[in-house]
């Protein structure tokens, strides 16, 4: 089996920038490039093979045609390919998010949950992200803070710099701040 070269799926969310094209040579015709999904079988952005006899097929098609064995013996236990690797160029702040765990996501969304690992490829001088709560709050306070747009006041603002690595376990409230370039697994 030869090495597969993949073409990423490109995402143009409003908060994205230009660095993935200008500094990392990603091919994209749009004005804003927020994310490239480098290794993906996700239906919203599959990567496409660009070399060899499987050129033009998605990674998912390749796996279906050649069997899960091409991924190694441990992948046989997964229903779907369980990894999504992406580069994120956050020119602006991202929304606050909480991702479900596998049990909830498989039952309610039909796909795996999302625990993330971030490697900060680059960051501005005052760059930070939000990670978890400063203190425990109840459902009522949570709802009130969302309504009043004060939720950020009770989240940890974590300064980041190039080379930092962060583990974001599913169920953890988080958000990427502006002026950060991240590799996410």
Task: Describe each region flagged by the PLM.
Residues 1-137:
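Transition-metal
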Residues 14-19, 84, 155-164, 175:
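Gly/lys/ser-thr-rich phosphate-binding loops in alpha/beta enzymes
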Residues 96-99, 159-178:
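Conserved metal-binding segment of the jelly-roll/cupin
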Residues 108, 129-132, 142, 177-181:
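A short secondary-structure junction signal
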Residues 116-118, 175-185:
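A short hydrophobic beta-strand segment most commonly corresponding to one strand
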Residues 137-167:
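Active-site glycine-rich loop that binds ribose-phosphate moieties when present
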């Amino acid at each position: 089996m030869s090495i597969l070269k993949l073409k990423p799926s490109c995402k143009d969310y409003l908060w994205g920038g230009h660095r993935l094209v200008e500094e990392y040579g990603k091919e994209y015709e749009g004005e804003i490039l927020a994310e490239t999904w480098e290794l993906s079988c996700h239906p919203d952005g599959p990567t496409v093979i660009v070399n060899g006899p499987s050129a033009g097929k998605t990674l998912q098609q390749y796996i279906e045609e050649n069997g899960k064995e091409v991924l190694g013996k441990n992948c046989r236990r997964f229903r779907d390919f369980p990894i999504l690797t992406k580069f994120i160029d956050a020119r602006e702040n991202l929304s606050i998010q909480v991702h479900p765990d596998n049990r909830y996501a498989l039952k309610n969304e039909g796909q795996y949950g999302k625990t993330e690992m971030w490697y900060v490829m680059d960051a501005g001088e005052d760059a930070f992200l939000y990670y978890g709560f400063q203190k425990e709050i109840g459902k009522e306070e949570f709802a009130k803070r969302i309504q009043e747009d004060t939720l950020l006041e009770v989240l940890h603002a974590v300064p980041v710099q190039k080379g930092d690595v962060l583990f974001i376990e599913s169920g953890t409230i988080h958000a990427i701040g502006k002026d950060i370039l991240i590799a996410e697994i």
